[in-house]
Structure formats: structure tokens, C-alpha cells
């Protein structure tokens, strides 16, 4: 039976419907606002998996029919998800994952399908709402509901779920997700806002999503409040657990006191191997042996979790010996790659990232065929996380969702300081190569990227750095950690990344593993993050603070000239003939914009100079009183037509040919002849009157 509820956020009506579509899924919700509709389904296996983690997958699918379009390409159907679709899938996943009950191991899949879109409402908000609503109304164990809103600030006022027009005027673009208890996820970019403004935006976001939570509760009640299915969480034999913990606890505690990551892992693995030999050697039953091995691995991880957190809360000492606020040692280098246009190596503790910058022309822009039309991107950041960066062997086939997500965060952090395209008309590509990783390689990417941009001579508006904050919370005891290790991310309760400059924040991202985080904790984390990134930025600027005076000798030089818009067609020519001729003659790349801005790119300054001269000749206009060397293109009874400039001809009347009387023009002049003429007049219609006689006097 169809059930519908309607609510409003930010003055925009949102409707959630269930019971009409996709009824064989465990849960389904159709969420709509105006002409925007997203169908979200939730399905969970009835049988528990043997994995030691919760196997949740989220798919976000954009259908081109949603905007009345047919996909491009040969096959004319939707292909693999775009980067934007992957990022939205991650936004759906991140707030719902910590809300599933502990120990639930059933394979679960969320599929969000865009059915209709006009660009007036953020689809990721509808999809996130639909995922929670589908789970909330199903029998799948889920401790929701959750909801998300997009936050902008226009003319000093916060706006929930803004329109594209409002976003153009906004100094922030943040997505906030949570429950009634507090926030679960934050993702956003800002234009140098203060920590106080960021906190105010988060509070506004939390208040704005409450109506969406109420609507889901109403929908569940109206749909019949289906009982949640029972499940059995993995358990460990109590006697075996007691023996294993007694044997392992001191060894795990000793291992966690080792500062170097690989040595620490080796010591923990050795302790686990010794425990396996001591506790499992006499087990003959293969199934029981398999079960006990799984249990032993779980016990080892639990002990790491307990001991690491105890060290921090009881003694204020972290795994690598630091206190809660200290940033790991930092080392920086620039210009280490001779042919790259810019390069920077950023090392913080056992995290090392190589950033490279390549400068290109308009031909190098990324073009993305999206639901709402073709998008052009002049700035790209690609993040690579090879398995060797964590000392492992692994497959290297394509870009992972994690790599796309981390790259996007770093891209948003850096975007705020890039020069305006009008002042620096280059396509910019940053590539981040994570060479070593032990925590916050995405923030390392921000730092190495900035140093590579400075090395490349890009005139940045300022420098930014990033730091990852962590949280350990046990009851009322709380420790906020600056510059977290990989283990602290894994064993902690929060991963809160903040990037910016002394002037303010440019990007932030938060994910938590507990039911919520208070605003007091977030305020403390933002304050510590400000201190941390100021320290990191100071270390970076010891090596390089301002851009190099010029770009790399291997980068294309781009010169910009401005012409009248009505002259553009003359430069392009019929079918592109003229502009093609210029590029073939000089080897340059030419980009023409609608406002008459022309960018000429070449590694050869002489070629650029020649191309500019050719363009100036094409667009030149006849000047009264100026002498030109022209070619006679046509003889008439009353005079001759002379081409004095490309696309510009003037009339040399028979009376202006000579001081002597001329009986016939052909007696004096011939077609193709080159003569000197003077411009006497240019009338309102652009017709040019010439004289040869004036030069003979």
C-alpha cells in the first residue's frame, strides 16, 4: 500500500513515498522535491556472511532519461559511474554505516537511482534521505533514522538545501548528516571561514535536518512499523577469550609502545603467532580450528583497541609517544623532478606524499558529460594510493572509490587559493603519489600539492595546509588528537580533517564511528586543528613561501590578447579555415572565448609572437590618414578595389589614382599589383575610401 509523507526544509517541500515501487526489496523509498525524484532501495541478505566486518555497499546511479537526454558514446547507454556519482555514493554510505547495530554481518546493498532531475535541488540530499527512509521502514536492523542537508551562506545568512543561483553567491558548500543525538558526517568546502562560523553552520545544519527525521518516523508509523529482524552477532567462547587475553594483553601493550609502524606490526603479529601456537596446537577438529583462529584474530584487534585507548585516556600518551596535540616531525622538498612543471615532497612522520603539477592549455580541460550537461574542469587533482605505501602486495586495477574521495577532498581544499583563470589561463593538474602512509595521506596531498604549485610558479592567493584530527571517547572521558596515525584512525571514534590557512578554513570532512559527537568536542577539534595546520604551514614555508618568479621552461607559455567580440568570426574564418591556418603556420594552440579573450599557447616565444601578429593583422581596422601597402583585387570602370588588410578592402576611385587625368583604370593599374594607398575616409557603414594621388603630391 502506498504511503506518503511531506515535510519542508529551507522553504522547499520534500515528499517521501513507500509501498508503490520496488516492493520486493526489503525497503524502498521514492523521495522527491519539485521535478527531482530519487528511488532508493535497501536489501539485506538473510544469511550472515563469514566476513569480520559489515559488508555494506552503496550504489548511486544517474539515468540520463532523468533529464530527457540520450547518453553519448557508441553504445548510447549509461556506463560506469562518474566520479561525482562515486562521491555521492560515499556521501550516502558514510552517515548510515555507523548506525547499523554492532555485530550485524549480513551483506547489505543500497541502490539510489535518479529518475528525474532539473538541477534545482541537491540530489545527494534526496538520495541520503531515501537510503535512511528505506532502511527505517524495512525489517533490516538499523538504529536510524538519519538525514542530511546541504548548507550555504548567502549575504551572511545560512540557507538549507540552496538553489544553484544561491550557491553562486555562497562562501560555503557543506553537507551535514546526523541523527537527533548529533552529527555523523560533515563534508564541505569554504572560502576561508572562521572556526566559529564553521561551528555555527554545523549547528544550523543539525537543526535543519530534524524535520527530515520526523518525517521518516511518521512514514514508518503510517506504513505499519515493521519489526526489525533478529540476528546473531558473532560471539567468542568465554574460556578461550579469557586464556587468550591473559596471554596476549602484556605482549600487545608492549607492541603498542613501539614507535615505528612496521616494527610495531611485526611485534603484534609475533604475539598473535605465539598465542596461536600455544592455544590452538591441540585442536584436531578443522571447523573448530577455523573458528578459533577467527576468534583469536578478533581478540587481538580488541586488545589493540583497548590498550591504545587506555594509553591515551589514562596516561595521555599516544602509540608513537606523542601527547595529544603534537604534530609528527615534518620534512619538505621542492623541485625534485626535473621535467615536471612543479613538484613537492611532503613527509610527516611515516606519511610521505609526492605532489606534481602539470600546466596545460584549454585543450587539456576535462570534459564530463553529466546529467545536467557538459562540464568543463580547468583544475584536476588525482590521488593515487598504491599498496606498497603501506608495505603490502595488492592489485592495481583502476581508481578506487577511496582514491576518488580523498582526491576530491584535497582538490576542494586547494581550489580556494588558485588564481583566477583570467589572470592565469592554464589548465592545472595535480597528481598525488602516496609513497608511504601512516595516517592522513589526503591532508599530506594538500600540503605536497601546495608546494608543487609554488614550485611550478602558480601565483596562489595564499598557502594552505591540512591536518587530521581524531577522538577517543569513553563515557565522559574525551581526548581530541592532532595529526592522527593510521592506527588512531582505525582504533579511534572520529576522523576529522580540516584544511585551510591562517585566514580561515577551505575544506573539512568528518566521519565518526559512534552514535554522535557533541558540538563541544567539535569546537575543541576545530581549535586544535587551527593550531596544527598553522604549525604545518610554518614548516612548509621554511622551504618555499612564494611562487617561483616564472613557470617551468617545459610548460607552455600562454599570452592573452583581447579583441572585439564581433571580430571573432574573422579570426576563426569559414569552417575554422583562418584559425587553422594560423596554428599550422606557427604551431601554437589558440583558445577563443565568447567575450573576445584569446589565449595563445606555445613553448616557443617567437611562434607566439608571430601568431599574435597574424591575429592583429586579421582584426586590424583601417585608420584615416594612414598609409597601407595593398593588393589590387578588382578593376572597375570607376576605380579599383584594393585589399589593404585581411578582410578589409577599400575603393580607390579613378579620380584618386593619379595627379594626371586617367582615361581607363586598366591603363594604369593591373589586378594583383601591389601599390601604396592612403585612407581618406571610413564611413558609418565601414566603407573605406582610398587615395594614391595623395601620396604622389
From Swiss-Prot:
The keyword Cytoplasm applies. One of its GO terms (molecular function) is 3'-5'-RNA exonuclease activity. PROSITE patterns: KH_TYPE_1, S1. Its main location: cytoplasm. Its cofactor is Mg(2+). Keywords: Cytoplasm, Magnesium, Metal-binding, Nucleotidyltransferase, RNA-binding, Transferase. Transmembrane segments: none annotated. GO terms for biological process: mRNA catabolic process; RNA processing. InterPro entries: ExoRNase_PH_dom1, ExoRNase_PH_dom2, ExoRNase_PH_dom2_sf, KH_dom, KH_dom_type_1, KH_dom_type_1_sf, NA-bd_OB-fold, PNPase. It comes from the Bacteria. It is found in: Cytoplasm. It catalyses: RNA(n+1) + phosphate = RNA(n) + a ribonucleoside 5'-diphosphate. Residues 556-615 form the KH domain. One of its GO terms (cellular component) is cytosol. Residues 625-693 form the S1 motif domain. It holds the Pfam family PNPase. Its EC number is 2.7.7.8. Mg(2+) binds at residues 489, 495. It is an enzyme of class 2 (transferase). The keyword Aminoacyl-tRNA synthetase does not apply. NCBIfam families: polynuc_phos, PRK11824.1. This is Polyribonucleotide nucleotidyltransferase. The gene is pnp.
Amino acid at each position: 500500500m502506498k504511503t506518503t509523507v511531506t515535510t519542508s526544509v529551507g522553504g522547499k517541500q520534500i515528499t517521501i513515498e513507500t509501498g508503490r515501487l520496488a516492493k520486493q526489496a526489503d525497503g524502498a523509498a521514492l523521495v522527491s522535491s519539485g521535478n527531482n525524484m530519487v528511488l532508493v532501495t535497501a536489501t539485506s541478505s538473510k544469511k550472515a556472511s563469514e566476513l569480520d566486518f559489515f559488508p555494506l555497499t552503496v550504489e548511486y546511479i544517474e539515468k540520463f532519461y532523468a533529464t530527457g537526454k540520450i547518453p553519448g558514446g557508441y553504445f548510447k547507454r549509461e556506463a560506469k559511474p562518474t566520479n561525482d556519482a562515486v562521491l555521492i555514493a560515499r556521501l550516502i554510505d558514510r552517515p548510515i554505516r555507523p548506525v547499523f547495530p554492532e555485530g550485524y554481518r549480513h551483506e547489505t546493498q543500497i541502490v539510489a537511482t535518479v529518475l528525474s532531475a532539473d538541477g534545482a535541488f541537491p540530489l545527494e540530499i534526496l538520495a541520503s534521505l531515501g537510503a535512511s527512509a528505506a532502511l527505517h521502514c524495512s525489517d533490516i536492523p538499523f538504529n536510524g533514522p538519519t538525514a542530511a542537508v546541504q548548507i550555504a551562506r548567502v549575504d551572511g545568512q545560512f540557507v538549507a538545501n540552496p538553489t544553484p543561483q544561491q550557491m553562486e553567491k555562497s562562501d560555503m558548500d557543506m553537507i551535514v548528516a546526523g541523527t537527533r543525538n548529533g552529527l555523523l558526517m560533515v563534508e564541505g568546502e569554504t572560502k576561508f571561514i572562521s572556526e566559529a562560523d564553521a561551528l555555527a553552520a554545523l549547528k544550523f545544519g543539525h537543526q535543519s535536518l530534524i524535520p527530515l527525521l520526523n518525517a521518516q518516523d511518521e512514514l514508518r508509523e503510517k506504513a505499519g512499523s515493521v519489526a526489525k529482524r533478529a540476528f546473531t552477532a558473532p560471539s567468542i567462547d568465554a574460556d578461550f577469550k579469557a586464556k587468550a587475553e591473559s596471554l596476549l594483553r602484556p605482549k600487545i601493550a608492549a607492541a603498542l609502545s613501539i614507535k615505528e609502524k612496521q616494527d610495531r606490526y611485526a611485534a603484534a603479529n609475533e604475539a598473535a603467532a605465539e598465542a596461536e601456537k600455544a592455544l590452538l596446537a591441540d585442536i584436531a577438529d578443522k571447523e573448530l580450528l577455523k573458528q578459533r583462529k577467527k576468534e583469536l584474530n578478533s581478540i587481538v584487534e580488541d586488545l589493540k583497541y583497548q590498550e591504545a585507548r587506555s594509553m591515551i585516556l589514562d596516561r595521555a600518551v599516544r602509540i608513537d609517544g606523542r601527547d595529544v596535540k603534537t604534530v609528527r616531525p615534518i620534512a619538505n622538498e621542492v623541485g625534485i623532478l626535473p621535467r615536471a612543471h612543479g613538484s613537492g615532497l611532503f613527509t610527516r612522520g611515516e606519511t610521505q606524499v609526492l605532489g606534481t603539477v602539470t600546466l596545460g592549455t584549454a585543450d587539456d580541460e576535462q570534459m564530463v558529460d553529466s546529467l545536467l550537461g557538459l562540464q568543463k574542469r580547468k583544475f584536476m587533482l588525482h590521488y593515487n594510493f598504491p599498496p606498497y605505501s603501506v608495505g603490502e602486495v595488492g592489485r592495481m586495477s583502476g581508481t578506487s572509490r577511496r582514491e576518488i574521495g580523498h582526491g576530491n577532498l584535497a582538490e576542494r581544499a586547494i581550489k580556494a587559493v588558485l588564481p583566477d583563470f583570467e589572470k592565469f589561463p592554464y589548465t592545472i593538474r595535480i597528481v598525488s603519489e602516496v609513497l608511504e602512509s601512516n595516517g592522513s595521506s589526503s591532508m599530506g596531498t594538500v600540503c605536497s600539492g601546495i608546494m608543487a604549485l609554488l614550485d611550478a610558479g602558480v601565483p596562489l592567493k595564499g598557502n594552505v595546509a591540512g591536518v587530521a584530527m581524531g577522538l577517543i571517547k569513553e563515557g565522559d572521558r574525551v581526548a581530541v588528537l592532532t595529526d592522527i596515525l593510521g592506527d588512531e584512525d582505525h582504533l579511534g571514534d572520529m576522523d576529522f580533517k580540516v584544511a585551510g590557512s591562517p585566514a580561515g578554513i577551505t575544506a573539512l570532512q568528518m566521519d565518526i564511528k559512534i552514535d554522535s559527537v557533541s558540538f563541544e568536542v567539535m569546537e575543541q577539534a576545530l581549535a586544535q586543528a587551527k593550531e596544527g595546520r598553522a604549525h604545518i604551514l610554518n614548516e612548509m614555508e621554511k622551504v618555499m613561501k612564494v611562487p617561483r618568479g616564472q613557470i617551468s621552461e617545459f610548460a607552455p607559455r600562454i599570452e592573452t590578447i583581447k579583441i572585439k567580440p564581433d571580430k571573432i568570426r574573422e579570426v576563426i574564418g569559414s569552417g575554422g579555415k583562418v584559425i587553422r591556418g594560423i596554428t599550422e603556420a606557427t604551431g601554437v594552440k589558440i583558445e577563443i572565448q565568447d567575450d573576445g579573450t584569446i589565449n595563445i599557447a606555445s613553448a616557443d616565444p617567437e611562434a607566439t609572437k608571430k601568431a599574435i601578429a597574424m591575429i592583429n593583422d586579421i582584426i586590424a581596422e583601417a585608420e584615416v590618414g594612414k598609409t597601407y601597402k595593398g593588393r589590387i583585387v578588382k578593376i572597375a570602370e570607376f576605380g579599383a578595389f584594393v585589399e589593404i588588410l585581411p578582410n578589409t578592402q577599400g575603393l580607390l576611385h579613378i579620380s584618386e589614382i593619379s595627379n594626371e587625368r586617367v582615361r581607363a583604370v586598366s591603363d594604369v593599374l593591373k589586378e594583383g599589383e601591389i601599390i601604396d594607398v592612403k585612407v581618406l575616409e571610413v564611413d558609418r557603414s565601414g566603407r573605406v575610401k582610398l587615395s594614391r594621388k595623395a601620396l604622389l603630391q
